[in-house]
Amino acid sequence: MSSTLTCYCPGDGSLLGEVKLFNKSDIDQSIILAEEAQKEWKSTSFAERRNFLKALKENIIRNQDKYAEIACKDTGKTLVDAAFGEILVTLEKINWTLANGEQSLRPTKRPNSLLTSYKGGYVKYEPLGVIAALVSWNYPLHNALGPIISALFAGNAIVVKGSELTAWSTHQYCEMVRSLLQSMGHSPELVQCITCLPDVADHLTSHSGIKHITFIGSQPIAKLVAASAAKQLTPLCLELGGKDPCILTDDHRLEEILSIVMRGVFQSAGQNCIGIERIIALDGVYDTIITKLYNRISTMRLGMYTQNDVDMGAMVSNNRFDHLESLIQDAVSKGARLVYGGHRFQHPKYPKGNYFLPTLLVDATNEMKIAQEECFAPIALVFRAKSPEHALEIANGTEFGLGASVFGRDKQLCQYFTDNLETGMVAVNDFGAFYLLQMPFGGCKKSGYGRFAGYEGLRGICNSKAIAYDRFSAIHTGIPPAVDYPIPDSQKAWQFVRGLMGTVYGAWISLVPNVYQLWRNS
């Protein structure tokens, strides 16, 4: 078996280079190096960690052309796609962590009660040690740097396993972080970047040195990761697929909204976990929306990031083209209308590129396979809803529950959808705004569990240690004689405890008899 992985550009098929494939021994060594580095890093102050993030932010801004081009070469996306999906979101995450990270991880006081009035309590958020992030290929810079930012700020070290499909770029981004750490006097071994094939990946996910795993990917692989992690009872955050609905209720600001919808569908050629997979339009605007979508989609230009006249790039691989075409034909056979696209595209300039035509498929229903599977492709799938209730039924009619978006002038109607959508996130009159806001990111149903980003994400990669203490030096917990071992009289002990419960938790009208019972049996 080869010890290296050969990487190609999906936009034109050109050779990018080779990346080392790790074996089990390599993984063991990476974790040992990370463990040693973390022992020192966990003692750094929040100010020191902020200094590193500020330097990382400056590095990204200064080299954004270079980093965007690396992402484009390895994924086939356009520069605009890289700007939105790689650079902007990473800088926003850094900014949020700089402003809110310390507050997220400061010890938090917890309330007491009448019974515990002499006690104080707080929760301390401690580093776990070495954590792992197994990330998908659609956003190699952001998917690698996002977990690194959180891990390092929380005092952890991290092992990043990128996808084999984008190993070339993931390796470069991680090396950039390692070099930056070293230049600031910190150990570069805090960040380990590994590439391995599935038969070796199990060694990482079942490794006793890994204290938490974040996985971004598909359901089938998530089940393997979860089973592997269970060998060590390693906690998981699973961010899986979505079939995110976009509900259009009226024609208010329709042209502006369709611009947002187009970005939500075709960003990175539709390879976006929170991308719009289903457009659900109410009867009154359905036909208008189809016409306007066709006018836009039919003029989209495909090509490489180096072109000036390109709207959409290649897909990262052509290994799903047969299945995508099959899903579209299945839908057509069941009553859907293929208005535009629907098949792979042989680019005249880049015949070895992985291009799929932007597609408009309308009159979809939940009975079609394409309505139930995540496409992860440039497909605008449109459903007609007879009523708000019908729109909600369509939206909730899949096994997924990641994100959703709702557009409309009627705030009460938008709130109806927000309250009843079975998803982890909803954007009202916008697409994906919850991500930029650094809110807890994740889904429900079969879109995974756990959250990253926000307060919840940072605390999720820490040990939440609950600490109770005496508020007053002269007041301590004491065991009343009636219940102290050896218990003198079990019946009187029971009556004593019963009186205590009534005194502390009972209605005020029964306070006197409960206090009497407590005194009598003490």
From Swiss-Prot:
<dbReference type="InterPro" id="IPR016160">
    <property type="entry name" value="Ald_DH_CS_CYS"/>
</dbReference>
<dbReference type="GO" id="GO:0005829">
    <property type="term" value="C:cytosol"/>
</dbReference>
<dbReference type="InterPro" id="IPR015590">
    <property type="entry name" value="Aldehyde_DH_dom"/>
</dbReference>
<keyword id="KW-0963">Cytoplasm</keyword>
<keyword id="KW-0560">Oxidoreductase</keyword>
<feature type="active site" description="Nucleophile">
    <location>
        <position position="273"/>
    </location>
</feature>
<dbReference type="Pfam" id="PF00171">
    <property type="entry name" value="Aldedh"/>
</dbReference>
<feature type="site" description="Transition state stabilizer">
    <location>
        <position position="138"/>
    </location>
</feature>
<dbReference type="InterPro" id="IPR016162">
    <property type="entry name" value="Ald_DH_N"/>
</dbReference>
<protein>
    <recommendedName>
        <fullName>Putative aldehyde dehydrogenase-like protein C21C3</fullName>
        <ecNumber>1.2.1.-</ecNumber>
    </recommendedName>
</protein>
<dbReference type="GO" id="GO:0004029">
    <property type="term" value="F:aldehyde dehydrogenase (NAD+) activity"/>
</dbReference>
<dbReference type="GO" id="GO:0005737">
    <property type="term" value="C:cytoplasm"/>
</dbReference>
<dbReference type="InterPro" id="IPR016163">
    <property type="entry name" value="Ald_DH_C"/>
</dbReference>
<dbReference type="InterPro" id="IPR016161">
    <property type="entry name" value="Ald_DH/histidinol_DH"/>
</dbReference>
<keyword id="KW-0539">Nucleus</keyword>
<dbReference type="GO" id="GO:0005634">
    <property type="term" value="C:nucleus"/>
</dbReference>
<dbReference type="InterPro" id="IPR029510">
    <property type="entry name" value="Ald_DH_CS_GLU"/>
</dbReference>
<feature type="active site" description="Proton acceptor">
    <location>
        <position position="239"/>
    </location>
</feature>
<comment type="similarity">
    <text>Belongs to the aldehyde dehydrogenase family.</text>
</comment>
